[in-house]
């Protein structure tokens, strides 16, 4: 049996169903991709704290994801939508083929895209997208590569916008004991 250690994914647990959004990029995620409906799966989840939901569902919240870091934002978007809000997503990837389930995000709210190769949306990184110059967001949640999240956090800090980041690190225990999930930080 394969061990899945700390891969970013979206887990929706509703009405006795477990729904996973994963990118099959390692041994553990490839094993998950081979599962069929009715197969048995031992899970220890949820781990960590997750994102803070907005108190006011009408709050203009931007969910920024890069690479496989977009997966947890899908769950957050569902939670916001179920509370009557309409999330905005800013998703980045190397190419359009690297974007995970774009249509699922589009069902939940506004979706803005950047690709490094200009194959979809605006060319560049998420922090280069024109929506950041046009719209005023009251909160930002981000998940993805560390350099991207640092850029997003700096953008938010410079504008006085509350920003939450979600680590995409490999985390062996998920409980804090092995310290893989610990990160030294300073204000952006």
Regions found by a protein language model. Give the residues of each.
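Functionally engaged cysteine thiol sites
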Residues: 3, 10, 117, 143, ...
């Amino acid at each position: 049996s394969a061990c899945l250690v700390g891969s970013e994914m979206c887990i929706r647990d509703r009405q006795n169903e477990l729904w996973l959004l994963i990118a099959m990029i390692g041994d553990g995620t490839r094993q998950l991709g081979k599962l069929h409906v009715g197969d048995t799966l031992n899970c220890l989840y949820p781990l960590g704290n997750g994102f803070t939901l907005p108190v006011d569902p009408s709050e203009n919240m931007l969910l920024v994801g890069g690479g496989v870091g977009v997966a947890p934002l899908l769950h957050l978007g569902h939670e916001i939508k179920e509370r009557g809000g309409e999330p905005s997503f800013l998703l980045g990837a190397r190419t359009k083929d690297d974007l995970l389930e774009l249509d699922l995000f589009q069902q939940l709210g506004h979706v803005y895209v950047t690709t490094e190769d200009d194959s979809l949306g605006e060319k560049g990184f998420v922090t280069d997208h024109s929506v950041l110059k046009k719209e005023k967001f009251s909160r930002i949640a981000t998940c993805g590569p560390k350099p991207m999240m640092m850029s997003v956090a700096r953008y938010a800090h410079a504008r006085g916008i509350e920003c939450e980041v979600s680590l995409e690190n490999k985390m062996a225990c998920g409980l804090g004991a092995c310290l893989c999930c610990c990160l030294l930080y300073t204000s952006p």
